[in-house]
Amino acid sequence: MKPKFFLIVLPFMLNAVMCYAEKTHIIEPAEFEITYSIKEQPFWDIYIFRCGKKASQYFCQAKLKRNIMLANDDPAYFILSNEEMKDLNTPEYEKKYPLSTGNNDRIYRNLEQGKISTYSTVFGTHYLITEDISIPDWTIYEDSTLTVLGMECKKATTNFRGRYWEAWYTEEIPIGQGPWKLCGLPGMILKANCPKFMLIEAISIKNKNLDPVTFYNYLNYKYAPIERMEYLKKVHKPGIYPTGGNHRTIEIDDN
């Protein structure tokens, strides 16, 4: 993307412009990037948080790699898929293959407009949920600390979108963002735990040789705009999959 064009489209890129088959393109240069490990027993996954001056993104690393392979007709994609199918019912499956709730979601924050956009795929249907950035109601514990990647982090807790979260944030990175939709603390969230569900923890931070904040849509999906509550009711409805059952999401307040 040419720099002049980028400056023109930036205020709009996370709003209506992306509602349909927007192609993969650079949003802006990144200032830092955090890699998070996800533990959702018995599964695991790796996510990337990338942040610039005006936008940030959060996505599953493995899903992005697979989409790139599929878009390029890479034979490795089909080899990997066949191996995964063979391992599906074996003890090795959970150790070898990344998997987590929300791994088909890509989350973008437009920091200027105060908007957050989630691009979600559920059984072949593609949704776009755009909403105001919601700040959890945090309780901060100044005297409860731990160290993550050599940085002192303070504890905070909240009930947000139907789940209880314990988070640890560092004021050494004075940006009130975090993994998934967690945000609004006096520093970057490096660790977040939802007991008996999901543990998220930063395993690396870098600020050099970064990929830019990028809108990814290598498969040129068309995303249908939908309200958040309508989306949750739709995907939580039993029988959304042919085998029965519903789609699991991190947020669960759909009543």
Predicted features and spans:
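Bacterial Sec-dependent N-terminal signal peptides
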Residues: M1-E28
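Extended soluble regions of mature proteins
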Residues: K23-N255
